[in-house]
Amino acid sequence: MNNTEYYERLGVDKNASQDEIKKAYRKMSKKYHPDLNKEEGAEDKYKEVQEAYETLSDEQKRAAYDQYGEAGANGGFGGGGFGGASGFSGFGGASGGFGGFEDIFSSFFGGGGAQVNPNAPRQGDDLQYRINLKFEEAIFGVEKQVKYNREELCHTCGGSGAKAGTHPETCHKCGGRGQINVVRDTPLGRMQTQTTCDVCHGTGKEIKEKCTTCHGSGHEKVAHTVKVTVPAGVETGQKMRLQGQGDAGVNGGPYGDLYVVFQVEASDKFERDGAEIYYKMPMDFVQAALGDEVEVPTVHGNVKLKIPAGTQTGANFRLKGKGAPKLRGSGNGDQYVIINIVTPKNMNQAQKEALQAFAKASGIEVSGSGKKGFFDKFK
């Protein structure tokens, strides 16, 4: 399997740091951007660069790619990341892609591995929440109130799971160990194994009278609200960790974390690539031929731009510092203005005569057979 192709697309070594990968991505992205490079195949190259960076910029995906190639990066060899679910979801209990081996041994030996103290504190599950941002909100940052459901300690029993006035007792069957010994006949002979206690289900505690609110779980679902300060310059797919805002822990363990994933809406005016912003500017062919000073919209407000005479479609001009804020760094990126010359469709008589006079002065025959046409002059 080829697990170096993504590095080759960006032109970096397999041991490159994240800063080196990001720098190379910016360079290659500009090189093949469809608005800046009109060569055949440039758009495909641009997509390949995007695909490579999406994987190599994520440490989990990169590790999977380094080990298994493209199949690993796409999730073909076990879990990683957040999946594609919107809203929120739990993260606990993931076992990767090799659970089958464990299942085989469990069928013989009752679930091997090191024994875990059932009464040990355990951190609660992590949650995920997706925030939709407008284009400008992602550029300048914003505060959002996020409301979601999470598991908190039961307000009635305080997390014990027992009815008020009672308390959990040590399990009578396993003696608080959470495991019981079982003798089994296996293909290897009669063997004594350990398995999870069927009374306390591994907790080591037995609740005689369950709490009427949480029914013995010690947790209850509660609507929870948290303020999220979205930093300026975030992009789709980036995530933010809010410590302690996930589900409640077990046996006094800490709360899990909330991971906020950003989804940025597209702009009907601008395109964005990291801190760089692109704007396609329609321009009359007379302005392009004679040159002009025009107003250009940016996310920071309109600015004036001088267009030199003879400007062609596809020409681009850089407005330094008029891009998006750099999330990891200082200052802003740049805005690139890509010129798109518009040919008039409906002209009045005066306009037609003016163009015919121009054609005559240029020695161009615009009609008739076998003679140069107006646009042949530029071929």
UniProtKB/Swiss-Prot annotation:
Predominant subcellular localization, coarse grouping: cytoplasm
Cofactor: Zn(2+)
Pfam families (UniProt xref): DnaJ, DnaJ_C, DnaJ_CXXCXGXG
Zinc finger map (CR-type): 141-223
Cell compartment(s), UniProt: Cytoplasm
Cofactor binding summary note: Binds 2 Zn(2+) ions per monomer.
GO biological process, one term: protein refolding
Listed GO CC annotations: cytoplasm
Keyword Chaperone among UniProt keywords: yes
Gene Ontology molecular function, alphabetical: ATP binding; heat shock protein binding; unfolded protein binding; zinc ion binding
Binding sites annotated in the UniProt record for Zn(2+) 1: 154, 157, 211, 214
Keyword Cytoplasm: yes
Record-annotated J domain positions: 5-69
Keyword entries, A-Z: Chaperone, Cytoplasm, DNA replication, Metal-binding, Repeat, Stress response, Zinc, Zinc-finger
Top-level taxonomic group: Bacteria
Positions that bind Zn(2+) 2: 171, 174, 197, 200
CXXCXGXG motif repeat residue numbers: 154-161, 171-178, 197-204, 211-218
NCBIfam families tied to this protein: DnaJ_bact, PRK10767.1, PRK14276.1
Function: Participates actively in the response to hyperosmotic and heat shock by preventing the aggregation of stress-denatured proteins and by disaggregating proteins, also in an autonomous, DnaK-independent fashion. Unfolded proteins bind initially to DnaJ; upon interaction with the DnaJ-bound protein, DnaK hydrolyzes its bound ATP, resulting in the formation of a stable complex. GrpE releases ADP from DnaK; ATP binding to DnaK triggers the release of the substrate protein, thus completing the reaction cycle.
Domain text: The J domain is necessary and sufficient to stimulate DnaK ATPase activity. Zinc center 1 plays an important role in the autonomous, DnaK-independent chaperone activity of DnaJ. Zinc center 2 is essential for interaction with DnaK and for DnaJ activity.
Subunit-level organization: Homodimer.
Family stated for the protein in its record: Belongs to the DnaJ family.
This protein's name: Chaperone protein DnaJ
Originating organism: Lactococcus lactis subsp. cremoris (strain MG1363)
Gene expressing this chain: dnaJ
